[in-house]
Amino acid sequence: MSDDMVLHFSSNSSNQSDHSLPDKIAKLEARLTGKTPSSAKPPQQQQQQQQQVSLWSSASAAVKVVTSTPPGLSETSISDSDDENTGDFLIRANTKKRQKVQESNNFSVVDHVEPQEAAYDGRKNDAESKTGLDVSKKKQGRGRASSTGRGRGSKTNNDVTKSQFVVAPVSAASQLDASDQKDFRPDGQLRNGECSLQDEDLKSLRAKIAMLEEELRKSRQDSSEYHHLVRNLENEVKDLKDQEQQGKQKTTKVISDLLISVSKTERQEARTKVRNESLRLGSVGVLRTGTIIAETWEDGQMLKDLNAQLRQLLETKEAIERQRKLLKKRQNGDKNDGTDTESGAQEEDIIPDEVYKSRLTSIKREEEAVLRERERYTLEKGLLMREMKRIRDEDGSRFNHFPVLNSRYALLNLLGKGGFSEVYKAYDLVDHRYVACKLHGLNAQWSEEKKQSYIRHANRECEIHKSLVHHHIVRLWDKFHIDMHTFCTVLEYCSGKDLDAVLKATSNLPEKEARIIIVQIVQGLVYLNKKSQKIIHYDLKPGNVLFDEFGVAKVTDFGLSKIVEDNVGSQGMELTSQGAGTYWYLPPECFELNKTPMISSKVDVWSVGVLFYQMLFGKRPFGHDQSQERILREDTIIKAKKVEFPVTRPAISNEAKDLIRRCLTYNQEDRPDVLTMAQDPYLAYSKK
């Protein structure tokens, strides 16, 4: 058996450099056979053994395989069995196991065996314990009903068991050699391998470091260039922004200067025109009566000339009438004398009478023309007085020096002045458009309570107005404070006149023109009454209806507006500001004194009726020639239970009159609200 194993080991060996290998093999054979190393062998076997030793490359795997003894079998029994069966069986290498070991680990042969017995015995015991475990596993996993031997010929059960005990130690020893391969490797070779690997790794790392350092250097260089470029760009952007800012400032300054120059020219032209018109139409003078000084109007040359023409026409008319009377008296005297008159005499009497009639007709036409001129004079006088008042208010305003408010709005000329506010035409230097700046001022002599009340009132107006976006309602763009006593609201600018100026220039409007204006006003009111919180304007009058450059009517001034809460019933809301508003355009319920008035959108419906009536007939339906104090004192509106229509040329349609009657219904319960009025067929336009 030992000879066959020697042959098996020699076939797997590739190392021939170890000359002490025969002694080691002799010791191993002695252990396997239970004999001493000095036991003699046949010369033929020794010669074969020496020949095979020179071809060995590794003995560690063979040592581990041979030294492993299966549990339950002694060395003597194994050697005996081998001696008994060496003639019949030949021990061969497990080629399958060998292929697995070579494919998985590709083990190398150990060059020398540890000479110390203690270390050798320890490795032997470890191998035996591992071999026992492997044998038990193979017995459980590889048991079959019948098996065939790996040698030549058939084997008995004892032979199969023996072959299993021989093969199993080889596998276990191979595993042990794989796990302890590093233990049998020479320290020098291990250090040389590790050093070579470390040198290669070090070279690779140094190459990588050099490459990374080069990349870092390039990145830093690029970063420096980029930073330099960024700084240059930032400086350029800063310079451009500075230039742009300077350009904007220069542009704003140029625009502001041009606007101021134009406004100054307009102011001078307006004052020159007023002076010239004052000579023609009249001027305001001062009348002193004792200690009372009052302003009075002094008529101009135009009215004096018109009055002179009227007097002359009247005198001529009276003279002609006297001549006609004398002619008739002479004709009547001739008839009483009974004298016959010839036909020629009759013609002489008839012709003068026809001349007198013709002349009287001509005088009447001239008189009507002069009266029309006087009416036009009255309208021009009203416009002149309004312009004179505007100029006087502008001269007395503390904002008449063309300031720029909020670094944005350049004030130009005064448009008008109310009780506690001034409205200036201004230019928005940011959005580049004309706007109207309404300056709200607090009287320094007011009490703090009154100031707070006015501020709340103005803030409420702004809140209401800013939420309104409709093409028939003037927009509110902005709001800001000027000082402790003044703030400004910026409104949409309407370059056209207001309805009050239109009615002053023309006593009455054609029905077609008046109708389209009322339709636009009603559309704005419908918008106010379709919001989640309905709004009552409460101060509709000609001065609060503006026209833009295209003639579109827009409602403005929501200073007295009322917000109708959701919980208000059909009766409306309480009027808490009784006495405010313009009395000619307010309904009777606003003048009730015995109880708190209840109002609704029907207040605006009454105002629409008054506006429509005034546009068609040239005067208000109730209290036209009365002051507000007289209206309040004489209860003019409370007594206005029926509306009367004057005769006009051309005549007003019945549909227009019916709409006015419905709007001026005395009882609030019977009067339509805004949404109902808007459904009136007269206010609907349809394509023909």
Swiss-Prot record:
Residues 155-164 have a biased composition (Polar residues). Oligomerization is required for activity. May be activated by trans-autophosphorylation. Higher activity during G2/M phase and G1 phase compared to S phase. GO terms for cellular component: cytoplasm; nucleus. The active site is at D539. It is found in: Nucleus. The keyword Repeat does not apply. InterPro entries: Kinase-like_dom_sf (IPR011009), Prot_kinase_dom (IPR000719), Protein_kinase_ATP_BS (IPR017441), Ser/Thr_kinase_AS (IPR008271). Its EC number is 2.7.11.1. Residues 409-683 form the Protein kinase domain. One of its GO terms (biological process) is regulation of post-transcriptional gene silencing by regulatory ncRNA. It catalyses: L-seryl-[protein] + ATP = O-phospho-L-seryl-[protein] + ADP + H(+); L-threonyl-[protein] + ATP = O-phospho-L-threonyl-[protein] + ADP + H(+). A motif (Nuclear localization signal) lies at residues 97-100, 123-139, 389-392. Residues 194-253, 298-332 form a coiled coil. Autophosphorylation on both phosphoserine and phosphothreonine. Residues 10-19, 35-70 have a biased composition (Low complexity). Keywords: ATP-binding, Coiled coil, Kinase, Nucleotide-binding, Nucleus, Phosphoprotein, Serine/threonine-protein kinase, Transferase. Belongs to the protein kinase superfamily. Ser/Thr protein kinase family. Required for correct initiation of floral organ primordia and for proper development of organ primordia. Phosphorylates in vitro ASF1B/SGA1, the C-terminal part of TKI1 and histone H3. Homooligomer. Interacts with TKI1 and ASF1B/SGA1. This is Serine/threonine-protein kinase TOUSLED. It comes from Arabidopsis thaliana (Mouse-ear cress). The lineage of its organism: Eukaryota, Viridiplantae, Streptophyta, Embryophyta, Tracheophyta.
